[in-house]
UniProtKB/Swiss-Prot annotation:
Keywords: Hydrolase, Metal-binding, Zinc. Binds 2 Zn(2+) ions per subunit. Its EC number is 3.1.1.96. This is D-aminoacyl-tRNA deacylase. It comes from Methanoculleus marisnigri (strain ATCC 35101 / DSM 1498 / JR1). HAMAP family: Deacylase_DtdA. InterPro entries: Deacylase_DtdA_archaea (IPR018033), DtdA (IPR007508). One of its GO terms (molecular function) is zinc ion binding. GO terms for biological process: D-amino acid catabolic process. The keyword Metal-binding applies.
Length: 437
């Protein structure tokens, strides 16, 4: 890939970064950007935000603009973002135009900045803003902010230069972002902890500008496969409006947890898992556990009674056990774990056995359970409030003591816990039960 690194002569921050890039390259060392790509430096006289159509003069597949960052609330910061104007063009570019984004490159550089930032520097995305916008080549800005002190800081310049040279984009989940501040706090945290890579992002203050045409433009300019909404930063009406537009554009809406869970799967495999979940349990939510890579999704069905009793007995233990298995579970409404699971086809037989084994072991530990041939027999003893009332026990301290398993005295009579208990027995048929013990 041919990569152009462009700075402005009048931009102290950009010159700082450029000088450190050239120094590091001259010193040798193994830098992925230099080893894997063809690098060219360009310096312009004017401000970078006014460099519309510079890609017509620069022969490159990717443009990295290296620059200073200014803010009305100055704080030491290292940022990355793509350019564009959702509305007016007060800072270069054209109104309503978005430049092509490079989400995977921004993701890679953002992660490197977080690892290399000097003490006291905040690392974040910035939402889409300013020019240039009239570009055909994917580009991004990498910036030092926010005052002359930071622009000239050699530690910041070196950190940014190293972050650029060390960039090795991986397979990412390219996303659109909606809501939040200028510094895209939630989107930054997601990107730093997952494969979620944001292209164009709209802050809360400009969310009213989003319509179906703009959303489609954002998607095309970002190569996005899904969207993320920072719901806490938007009104319910605005969030709902964006969600409907994403649906109309056939772009999945992912929550933060779904982005995290999807990060271990090939994107096509994740989509197939979601589609299969919708087929077998419409409206259900998918939770991915240790399902990774790619494969053909398949359904694993476990007896609903076994799953239900396991959840009642040890919910956290069951979910923790699932976290160690290459499986996804479904939930719907008040039913936290449906009895239908999804795994890859080549592991379906093993997963059916592993999930059954997990359930049986948890029930044998947590419940008064015995094995009777191919049946797991659960004997449950419960405090019975009606029996307590028949023994003359009023609600209050004595009631609570009996419920807690302690004998009580009332009117000269001792009432023991077993006198106010009800026993129920449930038999769960598990063919070949001895294999799961």
């Amino acid at each position: 890939m041919r990569i152009a690194l462009i700075n402005s002569q009048q931009d102290v921050g950009g010159v700082n970064i450029k000088n450190h890039l050239q120094t590091l390259l001259a010193a040798g060392g193994r830098w992925p950007l230099a080893e894997q790509h063809e690098l060219t430096f360009y310096e312009v006289a004017g401000r970078l935000i006014h460099q519309d159509r510079i890609d017509e003069e620069v022969d490159a597949d990717l443009i990295l603009f290296i620059s200073r960052h200014a803010s009305v609330h100055p704080t030491p910061a290292l940022t990355v973002h793509v350019t564009g104007n959702y509305e007016g063009a007060d800072l270069g570019g054209e109104p309503g135009r978005l430049a092509p984004a490079a989400p995977a490159w921004m993701h890679a550089i953002l992660g490197n900045l977080a690892a290399r930032a000097p003490e006291g520097y905040r690392v974040s995305y910035e939402v889409t803003h300013h020019g240039p916008t009239a570009l055909s080549t994917p580009s991004l800005f990498v910036e030092i902010g926010s005052t002359a002190t930071e622009w000239a800081d050699p530690a910041a310049g070196r950190a940014v230069a190293e972050s650029i040279l060390a960039a090795e984009p991986q397979e990412t989940i390219d996303l659109l972002g909606f809501g939040g501040t200028h510094y895209a706090v939630r989107q930054t945290e997601i990107a730093l902890s997952s494969r979620g890579a944001f292209g164009h992002m709209v802050p809360t203050r400009q969310i009213g500008a989003v319509d179906p045409v703009l959303l489609r433009t954002m998607q095309e300019a970002s190569g996005a496969v899904a969207g993320y909404i920072d719901r806490k930063s938007l009104t319910k009406d605005d969030a709902g409006r964006i969600e409907r537009m994403l649906g109309d554009a056939a772009l999945p809406l992912l929550s933060e947890s779904e982005i995290q869970e999807a990060s271990g799967l090939a994107w096509a495999a994740y989509l197939r898992v979601r589609e299969l979940a919708e087929e077998i349990a419409p409206g259900s939510r998918v939770r991915i556990h240790d399902l990774r890579g790619e494969g053909t999704p398949a359904v694993v069905r476990i007896g609903p009674g076994l799953i239900e009793e396991t959840i009642k007995s040890d919910r956290s233990g069951f979910l923790k056990g699932l976290d160690e298995l290459p499986v996804a579970h479904l939930s719907k409404g008040s039913n936290e774990v449906l009895s239908t699971f999804i795994c890859f086809e080549n592991e379906s037989s093993r997963l059916a056995s592993d999930i059954t084994t997990l359930c049986v072991k948890l029930l044998l530990i947590c419940e008064n359970a015995v094995i009777d041939g191919d049946h797991l027999v659960l004997r449950k003893v419960r405090f019975d409030p009606e029996k307590a009332r028949r023994h003359g026990i009023p609600k209050g301290p004595l009631f609570a003591m009996l419920a807690g398993g302690k004998a009580v005295e009332i009117e000269g009579r001792m009432v023991t816990p077993d006198a106010v208990q009800t026993t129920s027995v449930k038999r769960i048929h598990i063919p070949g039960l001895e294999r799961y013990i």
